[in-house]
Amino acid sequence: MNSSTALAHISEDGLRVQTVAEHLQSTAKLCEHFANVFGAEQAGCYAGLLHDIGKYSAAFQYRLKGGPKVDHSTAGAKEAQLRGQPYIAFTVAGHHTGLPDGGTRSDTDAEGTFLGRMKRKIDPYSRWESEIALPPSPALPPFKQRYELAFYTRMLYSCLVDADYLDTEAFMDDTPPPRGGGMTVFLLSYKS
């Protein structure tokens, strides 16, 4: 592993590393698997691939060496938003802090709302484009009611949070990530 490789995680003993690309790909596979239950596997994969691209920034790499905390989720949310995926953007933006309030166009970049965060200037993270190939943007299912869209976003969010947590936990424990578990097992048992 060369010194310019972007890292997502370092084991507590400092002997093992997980690259950002490895983490994004593993999380994407898990999120795709979980989201398949409600027909959103493409969106799950997309969210998993984008969720931590902010870890490619120099500021985050410095964080791994003891630097200050850094917002690494806004980068992926911005990329999803630029690609016409606002529901994935909400999901990615909140994968550590909870789904953000939407906000208003008058929100400033200092505010924690979704629209405020989309105005933030963030550290460059473009190295992701040479390591991660995004699939075509997923189509949004045809929703008849607004609550369906809200429910879809919350389900996708849950899939991403679980996938991210499970992949990170598996790396830290040096075990393969589990397939399913928790709410996924519950949903699969009731799938018609």
What is the role of each PLM region?
Residues 1-191:
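Accessory nucleic-acid engagement/destabilization modules that flank
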